[in-house]
Amino acid sequence: MDALINLKDCKEYMTITINGNEHQIKLAGIIEDPYFCGKDVCTILGYKDKEQALRKRVKSKHKKSLSELFEKKLPVVTTGNFFLGTQNELSYHEGKSIYINEPGLYNLIMSSEAPFAEQFQDMVYEKILPSIRKYGSYSIEQKLSSAMEQLALKDKSEEELQIKLQEERIEKENAYMKLRSEAKRHKEQIKRTLEFNQATKQIEPLEYIYICTTEYYQQHHKFKVGGVQSFKDLKSRLTQYNSGESNSEAHFFIYVRKTVSYRSIEHIIKGLLSGFRENQSNELYIMHCDWLVKFLDAIMDGNAEFALLVNSNREQIALDTINKEPTILPPIKLEQIAYIRAGDEPRDLSSVLGQEMIDSIKEAIESFEPMDNTVKRKEFELHLLSKSPNVSLTGKRRDTWELTRQLGSSINPMWRYKY
């Protein structure tokens, strides 16, 4: 960094060389109280919005327009030849230019993010301003200039490295904080959802499932299975059925049992016992009473066991859902759905089938020409046996087919497989 001020040759500006780039700063005022062109200083210090920097960073008492300085000429007339700045008549725009004094200069330097700002400040404070005041001229010797330039380049390289490392660290910290923030937000969202849905509240068997019939229906193995939300609804339900005509005088219950959700029980019964319904338009089941009660008890027992399992683990389920890391399972390939489930490790079929079978499958694949690129299992097995009659598929058909798909996909990706 180099600065050159020769007030004998030029009283209007000083020249500063920073990292090989030469800059001029226009001057105004007097030797005892110099003012610097604010726009020039902002340019050197890297301010993008110069007007905003001068407006917000420099106090009013530390800045003046050039026209104000020019008109007042700052009441010192004894300095004569050392009055700084242009002596020519100012244009309108020149007169509006903002100049800053020493405190204003420090304000801009302290607020600057330029890597050399601190060095610039030291130079202004220790050398430039004292030189202006005492001698009216200042220059940095060539050796010092060269040394400063090399130091600036070295500092710049090290500073750029530090800036890069700092930026990477900040980027990583920001990414980490963002992940933590997102994780926290998701946790809070899940927690609010579970609290709103009362996930930790114990479920109580307050509803009822029943079997209802009449004397006539009972003699013909006909029964109505239904449910209600409360005990008081049981009696009123007897008069509400629309289960077809009956020769008996009234319906009555032969089975009543508490449950958590009668609708889920009804849904299961309709799904499993739909073939025993009188027809699809009514809800009469035709089945021996002993079997119907057995089935209903089995469903109810399973439902009660499930409710017990949920109730005994509700708080832990909620805590795991909020705090535990997600379990990520690999997707199930549809062609493998009969053989593996999510989380299972694929088997090493080469150790299961042996090298002789593998070689036979490869040979059969290379000579196989499926119609429409669709490989059908039975057709390929016949082709395999015709090429290698000594191989046996007994107990190995699924493994053979699985390996055929794996090897075939690598040979011809266009092939499709039909079991």
Swiss-Prot record:
Residues 150-195 form a coiled coil. It holds the Pfam family T5orf172. It comes from the Viruses. InterPro entries: BRO_N_domain (IPR003497), Phage_T5_Orf172_DNA-bd (IPR018306). Residues 4-136 form the Bro-N domain. PROSITE patterns: BRO_N (PS51750). Keywords: Coiled coil. The keyword Coiled coil applies. Belongs to the IIV-6 201R/289L family. This is Putative Bro-N domain-containing protein 201R. It comes from Invertebrate iridescent virus 6. The lineage of its organism: Viruses, Varidnaviria, Bamfordvirae, Nucleocytoviricota, Megaviricetes.
